[in-house]
Amino acid sequence: MFDRLEAVEQRYEKLNELLMDPAVINDPKKLRDYSKEQADLTETVQTYREYKSVRSQLAEAKAMLEEKLEPELREMVKEEIDELEEREEALVEKLKVLLLPKDPNDEKNVIMEIRAAAGGEEAALFAGDLYRMYTRYAESQGWKTEVIEASPTGLGGYKEIIFMVNGKGAYSKLKFENGAHRVQRVPETESGGRIHTSTATVACLPEMEEVEVEIHEKDIRVDTYASSGPGGQSVNTTMSAVRLTHIPTGIVVTCQDEKSQIKNKEKAMKVLRARIYDKYQQEARAEYDQTRKQAVGTGDRSERIRTYNFPQNRVTDHRIGLTIQKLDLVLDGQLDEIIEALILDDQSKKLEQANDAS
């Protein structure tokens, strides 16, 4: 581990030199790439330097104990050693996490797709609840959201809603939302007071750049039509709505949220790139799992990941066994407690895998 940390520190120092090189300063691509690489290494290098400083202080303190000291001073040195050893242990654990392989998509924007599943209108209302939950969470993180496509229902729910979340690190936190979300509550239309169970599915896709997912123009069929509102009524006499079909994969994306056909096509292309990338990633994962004879775990969107129980004001994340009695706050966008627990669980599993591999 420490050989790797030395190599990281050397690379960081080399990047500092490169970023002061006039040839790099005058090359926008190199400047951007080196700056990003340096930023990615900064926390690891700072933590490693703090670790080395603590080790040095610890060695000095232990050396002092070899000398003749007054009892009171000796006790103070022992206390300092205890504190430094505790800090050293914490820094080692932090460095282990920092050295884990990074998800290359973590810093990207996100395309989120929420669809009503089992439960009819109640599922559509729940899809609307989830959409509002995520937009409020995004706002609390300083991220911006933008609707790409929506199919609203008459009672204020959504059969489907697709929206963009723009912000640094959005995917690193929202990627854990992939899966089936279940709600248990008494519908307003239920006279007998019986609890109904409904579900909605959430897909969280990283936004992909054109250079990352190559799509040939000949592989796309573009259809245009008049946009429509709830119930199918036309809301636009111009042919502004766009449907893109990726012929090789059969993936279809529609967008009619904008009045401009050009803007709708741009939004649809973003979703198409993300879905194609996700399809290839899922195929690669499935092949890997089959080779290793591993069962597909998190990331399988048919898997029920979380239950929202209204009568008990309870949210349970089934993947990590976390239950909190704060449903009202969670639906108001206060997702930090759940997401941070999921991140810690993910890191723990990666550390176990790294230890097993070594």
UniProtKB/Swiss-Prot annotation:
Cystine pairs annotated here are none
Q: State the UniProt keywords alphabetically.
A: Cytoplasm, Methylation, Protein biosynthesis
Pfam families attached here? PCRF (PF03462), RF-1 (PF00472)
Q: How is it modified after translation?
A: Methylated by PrmC. Methylation increases the termination efficiency of RF1.
Q: Which family does it belong to?
A: Belongs to the prokaryotic/mitochondrial release factor family.
Quote the cellular component terms of the Gene Ontology held in the record. cytoplasm
The entry lists its GO molecular-function terms as: translation release factor activity, codon specific
- Note whether Cytoplasm occurs among the keywords: yes
Protein function: Peptide chain release factor 1 directs the termination of translation in response to the peptide chain termination codons UAG and UAA.
Indicate where this protein resides in the cell: Cytoplasm
Q: Provide the gene name from the record.
A: prfA
| Residue(s) carrying N5-methylglutamine | Q233
Organism this protein belongs to: Geobacillus thermodenitrificans (strain NG80-2)
Q: What is this protein called?
A: Peptide chain release factor 1
* PROSITE patterns attached to this UniProt entry: RF_PROK_I
Q: Does the keyword Protein biosynthesis apply?
A: yes
Q: Which domain of life does this protein belong to? A: Bacteria
Family annotation (NCBIfam families): prfA, PRK00591.1
